[in-house]
Design a protein with these regions (language model features):
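A short acidic, glycine/proline-enriched capping/turn motif at secondary-structure boundaries
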Residues: 73-76, 91, 101, 141-143
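N-terminal basic, low-complexity leaders that serve as flexible interaction/assembly modules and, when applicable
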Residues: 1-86, 127, 213, 217-218
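Active-site loop segments of alpha/beta catalytic cores
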Residues: 113-274
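Short glycine/proline- and acidic residue-enriched helix-loop micro-motifs
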Residues: 37-40, 99-109, 161-167
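Short, flexible, mixed-charge acidic loops at enzyme active sites
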Residues: 82-95, 147-158
Length: 274
C-alpha cells in the first residue's frame, strides 16, 4: 500500500503527489512495445502473467507509486455475448438495438469470462513491492453503452444519444455484471477500482445527471469508498450531485487538464485519484 496514494484518497496535504500511468503501461513505453512485438493485445490482456508483466513495466522503470491492471474496458461487453476482436482497433461482433437487447447474457452466465482479470490482479499484486498500490478498472456505464451502440467512441455520439431510451434497460443487465467484475478485482488485491467514463462529457449536464448518475450511484452504493471515478470532458455542472460532494461514496475523483484545480478543490471535498 502506497502512503502517498492513500494520502491523496484521504485528502491529506503532501509535498509530492502519487504518480501512476493513466494508460496502464503506456503505448510509447519501450517495455510495452517489446512485449507487444511478441504477443497480440488480446493475449497480453487475457494471460494473467503477461498482463502482470505489462503492468510492472512502469513500476520497474520509473518507480511509480501505483500500478494499474493491464486490461481493456470492453471485456464486459464480450462477456455479455457481443463478441470482440482487435484489428487493430476494437471491433464488436454486433451493435446494440432495441430488438437484440434480449440477446445479452446475464451476469451469472457472463461472469466466468471475466475471471482472468482477477487472476491478472493477483499476479500483479504478487510482483508489486508492498510499498506500491494497485488499481483495478472497469468502463463506466455510459461509455460501455456507447461502444455497445456505436462500436466506437468518436464524434458527437449522435447514435448513442438517439438510443438513450435503451440506456436504462441496458444498465439493468450491465450493472449486475459490473458489480461482479469489480468484486473480482477487489478480491484479487486491487485497493480501489476506477470507473473510466470517457464518453460522459458528450452529454449535457442535465441529461448526464438524469440518466448516468443513477447508474453510478448504484455502483458506488455497492462498493462504498472502493471506487474511483473519472469522467472525460465533464464540466462542474455535471458533478452537481451529492454523489460527488463532501460525503461522496466514491474513494476519489479524477480531473483532467480542462479543470481549474482551484474549482475542483473548492467544490469537491473528497479524495483525488488523478
Amino acid at each position: 500500500m502506497n502512503v502517498r496514494f492513500q494520502n491523496a484518497l484521504k485528502r491529506i496535504p503532501q509535498a509530492v503527489p502519487p504518480v501512476w500511468f493513466m494508460r496502464q503501461a503506456g503505448r510509447y513505453h519501450k517495455h510495452y512495445q517489446a512485449l507487444r512485438a511478441k504477443h497480440s493485445f488480446m493475449e497480453m490482456c487475457k494471460d494473467p502473467k503477461l498482463a502482470a508483466e505489462v503492468a510492472m513495466g512502469p513500476i520497474e522503470d520509473f518507480d511509480f507509486d501505483v500500478a494499474i491492471l493491464f486490461s481493456d474496458l470492453l471485456f464486459p461487453l464480450e462477456a455479455m455475448g457481443m463478441g470482440l476482436k482487435y484489428d487493430p482497433a476494437p471491433q464488436l461482433g454486433w451493435h446494440l438495438t432495441e430488438e437484440n437487447l434480449k440477446d445479452l447474457k446475464r451476469w451469472d452466465e457472463a461472469k466466468p469470462a471475466l475471471e482472468f482479470q482477477k487472476q491478472a490482479v493477483i499476479e500483479t499484486r504478487k510482483r508489486l513491492p508492498e510499498s506500491k498500490s494497485l488499481i483495478g478498472f472497469v468502463g463506466g456505464p455510459l461509455t460501455l453503452f456507447t461502444y455497445a451502440v456505436e462500436g466506437a467512441h468518436k464524434g458527437g455520439l449522435e447514435k448513442s444519444k438517439r438510443s438513450l431510451p435503451l440506456f436504462k434497460p441496458f444498465c439493468e443487465i450491465l450493472l449486475p455484471l459490473l458489480k461482479e467484475n469489480i468484486q473480482l478485482q477487489l478480491e484479487g488485491g486491487a485497493e480501489i477500482v476506477m470507473l473510466f467514463d470517457t464518453a460522459a462529457g458528450e452529454l449535457s449536464p442535465r441529461v448526464y445527471l438524469e440518466n448516468v448518475v443513477p447508474a453510478l450511484k448504484e455502483l458506488a452504493q455497492a462498493f462504498p469508498k472502493k471506487l474511483g471515478y473519472y469522467a472525460k470532458g465533464v464540466l462542474p455542472a455535471h458533478l452537481r450531485d451529492e454523489l460527488f460532494g463532501e460525503d461522496s461514496l466514491f474513494a476519489g475523483l479524477g480531473f483532467d487538464h480542462r479543470w481549474d484545480l482551484r474549482d475542483a478543490f473548492r467544490d469537491h471535498r473528497g479524495g483525488f485519484v488523478q
